[in-house]
Every structure is written in structure tokens, then in C-alpha cells.
Amino acid sequence: MRRRFLIPALLTLVTSASACAAEPVRQDILGEDSVLAAAQGVWRSHESGWILEIDEDGITRWQDTPAACYPSPTDGPTLMGQIEYRYFTAISADTARFQYLPGDGHARFERLDALPAHCTANLDTSPQAVFDVFVSVFERHYAFFDARGVDWPAQVGTARRQLRGDMSEAELFDLLAGMIAPLGDSHTKLIAQIDGERRRAQFGLGDTLPRIDATLGETPWLIGLIQQTVTDVLDEDAQHIANDRIITGTIDDRVGYLQFFTMGGFVTEFEAGTPQWAAAELAALDTIMDEALTQFEGMDAVILDLSNNRGGYDAVCRSIASRFTDAPFLGYAVSVGNEPEPVARYTIEPAEGPRFTGPVYVLTSDVTVSCGEITTMMLRQLEHVTQVGATTRGAFSTPLAKPLPNGWYLELSNERFEDTSGTAHEARGLEPDIAIHPFPEDSPVAGHAAAIAAILADLDPR
């Protein structure tokens, strides 16, 4: 699962599932009365830098870095820092995959004889120790220094010369934030609590959102966009539904319209990140897509509007893609770290419910990020799909969570999402077939309606 949600924060979760023999056998780690015996022991993932220490009392997660190994709290400020593994799949006697949710993820763990000797709960929280862990985590796990044009060793050398043992927390935070700023990666962030104040360093948010924040303000802008779409663009039966995450309707009774603000967050009755939540999200999506695509049957085209999509749960993205194909296709592959081959490939099977395989237009912008980009990348591989709008953000990877020894919270990008040609679009985004900015500087609300009008104009000659 993944990414930053509009309201509230919701991130894609990642890990894995595989098998021990001909057929994978996934088992619950935490039963009602006991912890799965096969999962007990010490397990390490080099891909993610996590160690799981599992005994009859439950799971303790350790951060395993070249600079230090220490317990990882489960009360982080984002969902990726709060969730825990729930499922275990043996590959062999000494290797296994652990999952947060069924069907997502790919990190492989190897069994250790014992917790490594350098792992300790006695944390060194000095500026030097925190700096060393921060640097080592990036060196081991960050996947896009080259793609983002950053000379990390040079960054480290410059910052190390500024490091002092008597630095204040605020000074250290500024130093580390300055190191990640040149990456321009919105899936890489540093969050801290300093003197009772929450601080967040996150960069690479594109041009539109910072401009909107400095002028209209994001909330008034979104309200204006929603009112314009429902009142002026769509027919009278338009709906704003699914906990305000989706707009659905038609245009002139001949073009179907679906806008997703987030890929999840449709339900509120379950704790985010739990299996019950995941099942409810997909069930809610199925109901919405069944009704919408039944209404769209026989129409000239469908517009899938992801121009304001902030990402979400990867299974939702794959489920959406399954509604626009009549044949299986490879959606994408995921590689981690320096692995020469993808660790996971996702084939999209046609949905059992209603599908639409006429002309489909996917509307994007530099706000489109993460799972919104993955959906775009999958669909634009299909001949009947046209991407319209502006180039997407270029931040695909699920954030890898790394709490630092002093309690600060780091997330970074360690995965490469690749299309069927093996191309990763991280840092550059997905360029549209038809270029028109939905949120231009001189008309950030009206420009969205103009982009939809451009789609209709392209459709007419067809």
C-alpha cells in the first residue's frame, strides 16, 4: 500500500508473499491465542533493513543499519510507521516473506540464529550518531541518486564538515533536511518533534501545490474545483461519494466521468492498514465501479480523472485498471535496491464485473503522484487509453520507513516501479499524449474544465 492521502494521511503498505512448495501457504502470525510457531525466531530483510524478532509474546521490529541496530517504535507519525506484519509465507527452512496485507508486497526475510550482537536498546542519540545512521540508511536503501542527479557522497562530505557535537536539535534537523532537499523526492521526508513543535522536511511537490498554497489556499481551491465539476461540467445526476474521495457522473449523456482524489479512504469504520479495512476498501470500490460502468455502457468514452490524485493503496489501483481491459496484461514490475531482477510482477486480470474498453482518457497533472501514477502507467499501455493533461509528479516508490535513534522519523524511496518495457519513470514522471495543464497559473480552477473540454474536442473527430 502506499502514499499521501488528501484527507486523512494514508500510505501504501508494502511487503510480500510467496511460497514454500508448489503452492504458497500464507498463515496468520498472530492467532487469537498464540503466535505462529513457524514464524517465531529472528528474521532479517536486507532489502528493507528490518529485523523481526518474533516470540510467543509477539513481534519486535528492529532497524538494521550499517551504523546501528535499534528497536523500531510502532507509533510513527505516518501509517508506514504504525502498521505491523500479519502474515507469514515460508519459502524454505531459512527464508520467508512477511506481509502487512494479503496480495501486496515483496520483501524477503532470512532466518538468523540470533539477534546480531550490535543490536541494542541503549541508543546513542548524539548528533554524530543520528547523522551516521541517516547517511547509512540512504547509502544502503535510496534508489534514485542517479535519476535525480544528486552526488550523495559530495552531499555527505559537505554536511559532515558542518556537523558539531554541540548542535541543537533544530540545527541538526536543518542540516539533514538540507541533504534531502536536492533529491526533490516527495516520497522522501524527515519528521521531528522539536521543543513541542512538529517539523516536516519534504520536497519535490511539483509546481502546482506550492503555488496554490501560496495563493488561493488548497482547501478553497479544492472546493472550487469540486463545485465546478459537479455543477458546470457534469450532468445533473453527478455524485460526490465514497467519503468525498470520488466524483462520478456523465457529460452530455455520452461520456462517463470518474475522478479519484485518493486510491482508498472510501470507508471509515475500520482502522487503516488492517485486513478488514483493505477488504472494505476494495468492496466499496467494486460497488462504485459496478454502478458507474453499468451507467457508462455504450457511451462514447470514459474520462478517468487523476489530475488531483494523491495516491493510496496499490490494490485499489490494480482493481481500477482491471475495469478497462478484456484481456490480462502485465501492469508493472517492482525492483528493490540493487536486485538485478524484479522482485514482483503484477498481472492485471479483467474484472468480473462491468468493464469499459472503448476510448478512455486519463487526465493527469503534477499533482498526480504515487498510486495515481501507477494507475496511469498501467492504463496507458493499453491501445484504447490516451493520457491527457500535464506530466505526473514522478514519485512512485512506496516510502520505506526508518525511525532514527533520537525518535525522528525518516521515509525514503527504495523501489523502482517499471512498465512492460522495463522503464522506471521515477523523477521524470509520465508525459501525456495530449498536453494541456489542468491547473494553469492564470486559471487554476477554470483550467480544469478547459482540460475536460479539450478531451471532448479530441473525442469528436473519432
Label for each model-derived stretch:
Residues 8-17:
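Bacterial N-terminal signal peptides
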Residues 1-9:
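Bacterial N-terminal signal peptides that target proteins for export
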Residues 370, 380, 389-405, 410-412, ...:
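C-terminal soluble interaction/assembly domains
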Residues 256-259, 302-305, 331, 359-364, ...:
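Structural recognition of the beta-strand scaffold that forms the well-ordered cores
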Residues 423-462:
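Low-complexity, Gly/Ser/Thr/Pro-rich intrinsically disordered linker/tail segments
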Residues 29, 311-363, 367, 398-403, ...:
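Gly/Ser/Thr-rich loop/hinge elements
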Residues 21-302, 306-332, 401-403, 459-461:
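Flexible, low-complexity junctional segments that flank or bridge functional domains
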Residues 359-381, 386-393:
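Extended C-terminal subregions enriched in glycine
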